[in-house]
Design a protein with these regions (language model features):
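Polytopic transmembrane helical bundles with strong interfacial aromatic enrichment
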Residues: 1-124
């Protein structure tokens, strides 16, 4: 499908935001877990900001790139997106009472998310 120049720019911006924010979010989550919770309270705000940008950019990308019938690729991306939303919810719900437990759960969910995003194109 041919894209206009302006649509290509929008796609590049959304992809860049999605990937960069997602890398920070997942990377900081894995680092916090590995460090035994060190920095969890300091990074909570930036993590939630990155989660928001990642999810909103992903929604925008889905709306532009995945119109029409759903197939294995879309199902894989949807599983990854669901895990990402769940990870953000867990981090938000646990950041005051038990941040390390929440970060551990979120790390597992984000691992599934990253794998789904990486393999989606090749599924089916």
């Amino acid at each position: 499908m041919p894209w206009s120049d302006s649509m290509q720019v929008v796609l590049m911006i959304l992809i860049g935001l999605h990937i960069l924010a997602g890398v920070f979010w997942a990377g900081s989550t894995f680092t916090i877990v590995r460090s035994g919770g060190t920095g969890a309270s300091t990074l909570f705000g930036p993590q939630m900001g990155a989660a928001t940008v990642t999810i909103l950019a992903g929604v925008g990308l889905w709306g532009i790139l995945h119109r029409g019938p759903e197939g294995p690729m879309e199902h894989t991306l949807a599983l990854g997106a669901l895990c990402a939303v769940a990870a953000a919810g867990v981090q938000g719900a646990t950041h005051k009472k038990n941040p390390l437990k929440g970060q551990r759960i979120a790390a597992a969910l984000l691992l599934v998310t990253v794998v789904c995003m990486a393999i989606a194109r090749y599924v089916g």
